Curated annotation (Swiss-Prot):
Residues 299-336, 349-372 are annotated as: Disordered. The modification Phosphoserine is found at residue 244. Residues 306-315 have a biased composition (Polar residues). The modification Omega-N-methylarginine is found at residue 588. This is Late secretory pathway protein AVL9 homolog. It comes from the Eukaryota. It is a single-pass membrane protein. Residues 173-340 form the cDENN domain. It is found in: Recycling endosome; Membrane.
Length: 648
């Protein structure tokens, strides 16, 4: 069966690339102890050698603080080997067992407990499905009490590759283990703030321990974006690392010259002499210079051979050398002026006619899209086939190209990856961490999400204002919370029903993002956009994912209502929502809330004390009254002539 699942070149053909066992050595730390097939072709199954791109694998598979838990699960992402291909999705189950319980105790086991992790490296993001299978196998592997018995791991590899395929992404099983219901119950209306925060491509750090809660919350947020889990993460772990800024000196010479870009005049287009487009591929993973390859992306029959190129052609300037001050210069490939050019609509018509000439598979996701900037007042026609996201999109342009061009998604970050947070080649990230050192470095992120407390710490006051939900947004969030909380006790729902269930919540966010995108295409749309937040939409239009989406046409959006799903007149209930939101999120509101809780507690305690005091006084008064009445009835005549003596 192994031959059946592997091609003639020895490359695995199934979705599962490797089964790996990672252990903790008392001297060497975390290390790979077994891999099937071997991580390095030609090495043995017990080789400790790692590919350079996967050097952090042991620290991801056996995360920080693993010794504090008997067992747990972690999701992580690895970059592709040699810069080719897509993200590798890792799912790891780790356990620990007492050393004295082992049937075969190896010489290097010197501690009382043994920690090991079994992980699957897959080409498909089937987190929950692989986790369910892996937990069973890991339990059986530990029950053997002899870690040299690896036959069960080989069987796991063969079984997964024979039972899983690309069709696994089409059903709901891709969302197995990712529960938006639990997310809404925990974060309530703040879920929409998280959604918008990622739309803006900000640096977002999730923090909680244990790691299973961390990766579950982070990936569940991403599952709210249509198509993101299935097709939007193929480029989420790729970036262009650079050892030091001093190496940038060599990059200036390797920048593509002006001749590497295409410009066409009106006359050129009329003669259909488009020729061959040259594309520039950026070097990946330590390559200091850009590689230039010439490939015919589209060919048109040449009817004007022998003509010399026009010397008056304007050329697109090459991207500037990256620097800490402008780390996004290499990633942004569309000039903002394109969005504002009044003649763009006419130019787009020509560009859209050429779009179907670009085979989707012919342009790698890491290549720079082919674009030609508009030349104002030159009479030239601009060829804009559309920015290429490299993702498999639907008719609405989903998933959005958020996790592309250096914007990373790292469900779990090991401490050894800390440098990525400050790397100038990383545009941003959505990352998870369990180590408190990440949380303390607040200057390296735009927002820290405290999952345990359902708290979102946004450091920049301007960003807080920008993400402040509108009245329509608050209605939308309240609508979600009410439907989820009303059905939370339904034993038959369990997240699988429709209204208030997981699929229903994802459908609501799909309606929201579709309406938002449709609203941005409307003319005179200021009033419509105000329901989404005018400043938010303005900031979003400057992001890479929106520019890529807006540079291509999506006719299906013409059928979408651009109005906010919860637009309407302001009412008293809106005032209550706004007050509730302010109390829960503003610093002053939190203080007021804490004071109210403290005051309420003190009132209750004081009431009990007063009750006890009043009760005692009433009993004493009752006794005194009874005694007085008794005295009054027995000596009436005496009490009428002279008052009884009263003791002080």
């Amino acid at each position: 069966m192994e031959k059946a699942r592997r091609g003639g070149d020895g490359v695995p053909r199934g979705p599962v690339l490797h089964i790996v066992v990672v252990g903790f050595h008392h001297k060497k730390g975390c290390q790979v102890e077994f891999s099937y097939p071997p991580l390095i072709p030609g090495d043995g199954h017990d080789s400790h050698t790692l590919p350079e791109e996967w050097k952090y694998l042991p620290f991801l598979a056996l995360p920080d603080g693993a010794h504090n838990y008997q067992e747990d699960t972690v999701f992580f992402h690895l970059p592709p080997r040699n810069g080719n291909g897509a993200t590798v999705f890792g799912i790891s189950c780790y356990r620990q067992i007492e050393a004295k319980a082992l049937k075969v105790r190896q010489a290097d086991i010197t501690r009382e407990t043994v920690q090991k992790s079994v992980c699957v490296l897959s080409k498909l993001p089937l987190y929950g499905l692989l986790q369910a299978k892996l937990q069973l196998i890991t339990h059986a592997y530990f029950e053997e009490k002899d870690f040299s018995q690896i036959s069960i791991l080989k069987e796991l590899y063969e079984h997964m590759n024979s039972s899983l395929g690309g069709a696994s992404l089409e059903g709901s099983q891709v969302y197995l283990g990712l529960s938006p219901r639990d997310l809404v119950l925990h974060f309530r209306h703040k879920v929409l703030i998280l959604f918008k925060l990622i739309l803006l491509e900000k640096k977002v750090l999730f923090y909680i321990s244990p790691v299973n809660k961390l990766v579950g919350a982070l990936m569940t947020v991403l599952s709210l974006f249509p198509g993101m889990i299935e097709h939007g993460l193929s480029d989420c772990s790729q970036y262009r690392p650079r050892k030091s800024m001093s190496e940038d000196g060599g990059l200036q010479e390797s920048n593509p010259c002006a001749d590497d870009f295409v410009s066409a005049s009106t006359a050129d287009v009329s003669h259909t002499n488009l020729g061959t487009i040259r594309k520039v591929m950026a070097g990946n993973h330590g390559e200091d210079a850009a590689m230039k390859t010439e490939e015919p992306l589209f060919q048109v029959e040449d009817s004007s051979k022998g003509q010399e190129p026009n010397d008056t052609n304007q050329y697109l300037k090459p991207p500037s050398r990256p620097s800490p001050d402008s780390s996004e210069s290499d990633w942004e490939t569309l000039d903002p002026s394109v969005l504002e050019d009044p003649n763009l609509k006419e130019r787009e018509q020509l560009g859209s006619d050429q779009t179907n000439l670009f085979p989707k598979d012919s342009v790698p996701s890491e290549s720079l899209p082919i674009t030609v900037q508009p030349q104002a007042n030159t009479g030239q026609v601009v060829l804009i086939p559309g920015l290429i996201s490299g993702l498999e999109e639907d008719q609405y342009g989903m998933p959005l190209a958020i996790f592309t061009k250096g914007y990373l998604c790292l469900p779990y970050m090991a401490l050894q990856q800390h440098h990525l947070l400050s790397d100038v080649t990383v545009r941003g990230f959505v990352a998870g961490a369990t180590n408190i050192l990440f949380r303390q470095q607040k200057h390296l992120s735009d927002a820290i999400v405290e999952v345990e407390e359902a708290l979102i710490q946004i450091h920049d006051p301007e960003l807080r204002k920008l993400l402040n939900p509108t009245t329509a947004d608050l209605r939308f969030a309240d609508y979600l919370v009410r439907h989820v909380t009303e059905n939370r006790d339904d034993v038959f729902l369990d997240g699988t029903g429709w209204e208030g269930g997981d699929e229903w919540i994802r459908a609501q966010f799909a309606v929201y993002i579709h309406a938002l995108l449709a609203a941005t295409l409307q003319l005179d749309n200021e009033k419509i956009l105000s329901d989404y937040g005018t400043t938010f939409v303005t900031a979003w239009k400057n992001t890479h994912n929106y520019r890529v989406w807006n540079s291509n046409k999506h006719p299906a959006l013409a059928e979408i209502n651009p109005n906010h799903p919860f637009q309407g007149q302001y009412s008293v209930s809106d005032m209550k929502l706004r007050f509730s939101h302010s109390v829960q999120n503003s610093e002053r509101g939190k203080k007021i809330g804490n004071v109210m809780v403290t005051t309420s507690r003190n009132v209750v305690q004081t009431g009990k004390a007063v009750g006890q005091s009043v009760g005692g006084a009433f009993s004493s008064a009752k006794t005194a009254m009874s005694s007085w009445l008794s005295t009054f009835t027995t000596s009436t005549s005496q009490s009428l002539t002279e008052p009884p003596d009263e003791k002080p």
